[in-house]
């Protein structure tokens, strides 16, 4: 088990020394949809360190994925991967860069 403590703000704060990014998104319940999402990490040579899925309440067989990966929001590879993920995901959110 692990516990995370976070500070929530409505302001975007970018740190140059941040080394990890956390995101979440939803995808359709279709064959290969998760594979296509994860390919953005492979093509941009990003190291995914954690993935979790949680069922979406009231929507059978649909899940929200929480992913941590190494990088900084200022990195071009991270920007490129996030652009691709946004194009394919539903409700993608950047949870933090720390």
Task: Tell where the protein language model's regions lie, with residue ranges.
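Domain-level signature for soluble enzymes in the chorismate/prephenate branch of the shikimate pathway
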Residues: 1-98
């Amino acid at each position: 088990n692990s516990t995370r403590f976070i500070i929530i703000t409505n302001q975007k704060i970018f740190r140059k020394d941040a080394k990890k990014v956390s995101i979440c998104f939803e995808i359709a319940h279709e064959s290969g949809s998760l594979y296509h999402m994860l390919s953005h990490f492979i093509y941009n040579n990003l190291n995914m360190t954690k993935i979790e899925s949680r069922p979406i309440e009231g929507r059978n067989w649909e899940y929200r994925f929480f992913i941590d990966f190494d990088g900084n929001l200022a990195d071009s590879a991270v920007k490129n991967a996030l652009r691709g993920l946004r194009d394919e995901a539903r409700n993608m959110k950047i949870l933090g860069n720390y």
